[in-house]
Amino acid sequence: MLTGDHSWGRKLSECREDLAFIERLPGRKILLRGNHDMFWDAKKTESLNEEFKGRLFFLQNNFAVYQDHALVGTKGCTFEGPFYLDGRGRILGWDEESEARAKKLVAREMTRLRSSFSQARDAGYRKFIMFLHYPPTSILEETSPFTEIAEEYQVTAVVYSHCHGESRFGDSIRGEYRGIRYMLVSGDYLGFRPAEVLP
């Protein structure tokens, strides 16, 4: 499972070499959309899955299966500022226009995620792993619509990335929280080694 930012190419034709590299990796490859994946928008998921059938699976508005778990996911969205800080780096306030824009994007991503959960449940699955590119909460939040839907569907784990650099690794939930395991899998956080979500 790769949680986003697969290529810097803006068009599919510019990404083929990167996707071919991913194809050559061992095992089954399921891709989630990241904020840098400009070649892939929601309307293209179905056509990408048709073109790469049997080689790569693009996870958005659908679900994949591993053992007895349905794998659901979406890019997500997290408000990342700008924040206004005091001299000690404490947050005094933030840009409310940017926050409002982020809330609209969260609503859109939640619609996609709920559709994926619904499809998986209709297919008979009752165990879920939820994947996001962005972290499930911002540094201002303890909970969010993403943590709420994870609890609603009693997911086994929430797996996310996007947070890079030691100063950002603590931006969201890690470890056990309200009965759900939250895993940060950014490449630099893991030392560029795969993480085991399920045995």
Model-derived features with residue positions:
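Catalytic metal-binding/acid-base residues of hydrolase active sites
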Residues: 6-7, 35-37, 76-77, 135-137, ...
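Core catalytic region of metal-dependent phosphoesterases/phosphodiesterases
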Residues: 1-67, 142-155, 180, 185-186
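Conserved catalytic scaffold of divalent metal-dependent phosphoesterases
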Residues: 43-141
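Short glycine-/acidic-enriched loop or helix-start segments at secondary-structure transitions
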Residues: 11-13, 41-43, 81-83, 140-142, ...
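Structural motif
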Residues: 1-3, 30, 71, 129-131, ...
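A short linear-motif detector with a strong N-terminal bias
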Residues: 9-11, 37, 49-51, 109, ...
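Binuclear metal-dependent phosphoesterase catalytic core
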Residues: 65-67, 148-158, 164-199
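Generic secondary-structure boundary signal with a strong preference for alpha-helix termini
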Residues: 16-17, 46, 85, 173, ...
